[in-house]
Amino acid sequence: MNSSDLKNDSYLSIEGVSKKFEQFQAVRYTNLKIRKGEIFCLLGPSGCGKTTLLRMLAGFEQPSEGRIFLDGSELTGIPPFRRPVNMMFQSYAIFPHMTVEQNVAFGLKQDQVAKDKIREKVQEALELVEMPKLAKRKPHQLSGGQRQRVALARILVKQPKLLLLDEPMAALDKKLREQMQLEVVDILEKVEATCVMVTHDQSEAMTMASRIAIMNEGEILQVGTPSEIYELPNCRYTAEFIGTVNLFDGTVIQDEVDHVIIQSPVLKHPIFVDHGITGTEGMSVTVALRPEKISMASKPPKKPHNCATGIVQDIAYFGSHSIYHVELETEKLVYVHLPNPERGASHATWQDKVFLEWNPHSCVVLTH
């Protein structure tokens, strides 16, 4: 890795940061390195510490311990108005008595930028968010998506080194939220913005972020790309928090370099995984298996492992796919995600006996 790569890897550096409110530990000894130009997401449930961490980046809260660096300069202790950081709040915080262009220009006027320069920068920002024709409108004359674009233009117009987005899609309905997720990413990528966003919405994080940090009870449990977080969770909490997952608790009965065999009390056949875990025989583990990794048939497979028999108890129809709730002979409920057949074809239905199987590389072994 060359020196420029090292610099990019630590454009925003959070080093040993903790935050305590009296007896409550909101953020616990956090270390993060965020690259220049990436959209980084703090994802977790309400109360996990993600917003507190974001507020420390903005300067609204000061760390109890630790230091924060941006582009080589320390931010710790610097007040919000002196930081090269802009934040878009969940409510957008647009001034209702101002027009679109006045809202976008507000921060520049506060900084006493020359009028000609303000006019030029506001026009550029409105063109970036595709709203130059709405410059004279008031917020009440705009749709939810348009108000969000105004808020985005207002934080982009000052060209900050770091953008902070607090639950950016929370005020939008589902359809508009899905549309705006991609639009916002496109805008941020055009200006090569470095952005940290906070959300509790898994699909929002998976759609928008280049990397995600999973948070719970003030701690970061895993950092990775959306595919790494989904396909290779490092703990039970992450596996359950992202998407739907089947979990099988079991015991290691054989662990070799190229495979591990696990026996679960809820499965009649052992689970074979095509990689070792450097564990020991008798070790307790959990196997994570995503519903779309399981195939379902009306005839039993001819294999000694990675299979189960059950009865279809429920079917959730989602148009392009259905999720089958299959109760095994041991009363364990397993979720199976299958694409819906073409019109006229058929899948299993309620109370059908079905046979499940999965590949050795589809499982993830969790040791904690």
Regions found by a protein language model. Name each.
Residues 66-74:
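Conserved ABC transporter NBD signature motif
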Residues 64-67, 117, 217, 249:
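Conserved coupling/switch loops of ABC nucleotide-binding domains, chiefly the family-specific signature
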Residues 58:
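Helix-to-loop junction immediately C-terminal to a conserved catalytic motif
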Residues 39, 80-86, 90-240:
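ABC ATPase nucleotide-binding domains
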Residues 245, 255-368:
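Non-catalytic connector elements of ABC transporters
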Residues 43-45:
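The feature captures the beta-strand-to-loop junction immediately N-terminal to the Walker
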